[in-house]
């Protein structure tokens, strides 16, 4: 199906500012859109942390939060007020601050970060809720949510009810501060196949709700930091394992370079694990003294996250395509996103009716994933722009018997017919894609779908954008097409039959085909009464008759006398 180019309403133009894509909005609209998204994120954040309910998928929340920061930077707005997870209203001080972790974009960034650092280790980035565990005199004294990194909520009563978290410790751990991730225990979780499962929200919900002690049995703990613990990493891991924090030792590997990090990352992505992950964390064994830890200043560790299974993408335009059968399909053009190493710039929405039900306009944020064979798929609309400027769909008068001849209103269906006849299902014109057909039609103003047969080699060579080699190839392809069988030419004319049914009919000429009755067509494979009637309508169509006469004049096999 070809794009209805004239209907491409790209109301959002984009420019680059400090490497980020910025919407070219007037100041008033920019302020309004930012305020609306900021409020929505704040509402979701409040529900999430106060009620333990996730109103939106974790990944969507994270991506929209990043989008908000991007917009704020575009207009020079302070980003300090951006909603964060969790909220800043915890009152219990952390004995050691949570530093957070720097995110690395790709392997090149990992290589750069590792350069000059030694004694490096990699761990899975367990997806859950961060916590501080404080042990005093061999007993769990306090458990504090991450909060803003300096202070958080007192979770001690809940944490005491989680069987997997040791309530007593000995030796160096008898008086220790540990930081880790409370996670949802899984059996054989394969991240690549099963995804994130909204694990973070589920854990938060369990910790926030009251009277759910039995649900806490499904939670586990992964310790990723022991501030002021043993300087030797193997010793640190060994002591944690003896104390009951065995997962840390099992899933902490020494690495020397980015290749080893990548190998571990891929292995944990595709292997069965006891928890959900969203990447890996690389850390130095040598850490500063705990008194120097500050939020946002943990330069001794970094994360390399997995690419999200679905990406939030901004709709830049709504376009309409008309297929050879006349069916109108709506396509959303996107500000490009990367999914599984694939650059996604458009997604098929479906029919006009479906588009209207989705209520998608330029400026909206939609969630896009890859379906079978890497085809982009629209999953949901996650944020709607305040302005709802939508294009008007083309008239719906197109059908399977329209646009064999070119006209202003037939532009897109006509191009679709050219693309079809050049495909391997019809004449097999190698090298003739949509762009080539558009160039030829725009230059030489085809009258009908077979007008290209009358082009000379000089005309093809003079088509803008056609190099000498390409024009010669097209000239050869057009000449070879003249030798194609009658059946293939009929397929190129879009007879409403399968190729198998057409072969079974035994027709080898237009004259034979005209003599066939509806009863004859009904007896062919996969051809019932309805399709047989469509064949008769196709055969009797004035444009089809005119094309058959033109092909006869061109001495195409099966059409001449």
From Swiss-Prot:
Top-level EC class as recorded in UniProt: ligase
InterPro entries the UniProt entry points to: DNA_ligase_AS, DNA_ligase_B, DNA_ligase_CS, DNAligase_adenylation, DNAligase_N, NA-bd_OB-fold, NAD_dep_DNA_ligaseB, NAD_DNA_ligase_OB
UniProt keyword DNA damage, yes or no: yes
Recorded GO MF terms: DNA ligase (NAD+) activity
Keywords of the record: DNA damage, DNA repair, DNA replication, Ligase, NAD
Active site as annotated: 125
Catalytic activity line of the entry: NAD(+) + (deoxyribonucleotide)n-3'-hydroxyl + 5'-phospho-(deoxyribonucleotide)m = (deoxyribonucleotide)n+m + AMP + beta-nicotinamide D-nucleotide
Pfam families named among the record's database cross-references: DNA_ligase_aden, DNA_ligase_OB
SUPFAM superfamilies attached to this UniProt entry: DNA ligase/mRNA capping enzyme, catalytic domain (SSF56091), Nucleic acid-binding proteins (SSF50249), RuvA domain 2-like (SSF47781)
Keyword DNA repair: yes
Signal peptide: none
SMART domains membership: LIGANc
GO BP term, example: DNA replication
EC number per UniProt: 6.5.1.2
Entries under HAMAP family matching the protein: DNA_ligase_B
Annotated NCBIfam families: PRK08097.1 (NF005987)
Role of this protein: Catalyzes the formation of phosphodiester linkages between 5'-phosphoryl and 3'-hydroxyl groups in double-stranded DNA using NAD as a coenzyme and as the energy source for the reaction.
Family affiliation: Belongs to the NAD-dependent DNA ligase family. LigB subfamily.
Protein name: DNA ligase B
Gene name in the database record: ligB
């Amino acid at each position: 199906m070809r794009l209805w180019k004239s209907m491409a309403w790209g109301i959002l133009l984009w420019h680059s500012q400090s490497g980020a894509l910025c919407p070219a909005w007037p100041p008033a609209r920019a302020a309004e859109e930012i305020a609306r998204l900021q409020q929505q994120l704040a509402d979701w954040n409040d529900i999430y942390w106060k009620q333990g309910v996730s109103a939106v998928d974790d990944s969507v929340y994270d991506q929209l939060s990043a989008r908000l920061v991007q917009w704020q930077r575009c207009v020079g707005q302070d980003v300090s007020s951006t909603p964060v997870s969790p909220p800043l209203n915890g009152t219990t001080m952390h004995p050691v601050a949570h530093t957070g972790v720097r995110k690395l974009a790709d392997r090149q960034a990992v290589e750069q970060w590792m350069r000059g650092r030694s004694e490096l280790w990699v761990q899975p980035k367990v997806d859950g809720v961060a916590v501080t565990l404080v042990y005093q005199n061999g007993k769990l004294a306090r458990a504090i949510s991450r909060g803003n990194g300096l202070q958080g909520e007192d979770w001690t009563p809940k944490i005491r009810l989680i069987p997997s978290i040791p309530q007593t410790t000995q030796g160096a751990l008898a008086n220790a501060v540990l930081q880790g991730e409370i996670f949802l225990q899984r059996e054989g979780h394969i991240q690549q196949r099963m995804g994130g499962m909204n694990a973070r929200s589920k854990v938060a919900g369990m910790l926030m709700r009251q009277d759910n002690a039995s649900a806490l049995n499904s939670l586990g703990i992964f310790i990723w930091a022991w501030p002021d613990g043993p300087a030797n990493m193997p010793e640190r891991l060994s002591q944690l394992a003896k104390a009951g924090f065995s997962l840390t030792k099992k899933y902490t590997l020494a690495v020397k370079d980015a290749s080893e990090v990548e190998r571990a990352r891929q292995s944990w992505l595709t292997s069965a694990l006891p928890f959900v992950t969203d990447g890996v964390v690389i850390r130095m064994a040598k850490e500063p003294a705990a008194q120097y830890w500050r939020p946002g200043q943990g330069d001794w560790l970094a994360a390399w996250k997995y690419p999200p299974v679905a990406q939030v993408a901004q709709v830049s335009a709504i376009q309409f395509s008309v297929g050879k059968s006349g069916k109108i399909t709506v396509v959303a053009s996107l500000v490009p996103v990367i999914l599984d190493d694939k650059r996604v710039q458009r997604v098929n929405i479906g029919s006009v009716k479906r588009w209207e039900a989705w209520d998608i306009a330029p400026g909206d944020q939609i969630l896009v994933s890859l379906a079978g064979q890497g085809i982009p798929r629209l999953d949901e609309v996650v944020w709607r722009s305040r302005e709802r400027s939508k294009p008007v769909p083309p008239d719906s008068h197109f059908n399977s018997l329209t646009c064999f001849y070119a006209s202003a209103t037939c532009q897109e269906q006509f191009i679709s017919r050219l693309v079809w006849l050049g495909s391997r299902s019809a004449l097999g014109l190698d090298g003739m894609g949509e762009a080539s057909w558009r160039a030829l039609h725009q230059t030489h103003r085809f009258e009908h779908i077979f007008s290209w047969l009358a082009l000379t080699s000089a005309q093809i060579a003079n088509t803008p954008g056609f190099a000498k080699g390409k024009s010669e190839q097209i000239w050869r392809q057009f000449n070879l097409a003249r030798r194609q069988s009658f059946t293939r030419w009929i397929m190129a004319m879009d007879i409403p039959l399968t190729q198998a049914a057409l072969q079974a009919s035994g027709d080898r000429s237009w004259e034979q085909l005209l003599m066939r009755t509806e009863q004859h067509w009904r007896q062919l494979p996969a051809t019932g009464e309805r399709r047989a009637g469509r064949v008769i309508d196709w055969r009797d169509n004035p444009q089809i008759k005119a094309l058959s006469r033109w092909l006869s004049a061109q001495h195409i096999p099966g059409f001449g006398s």
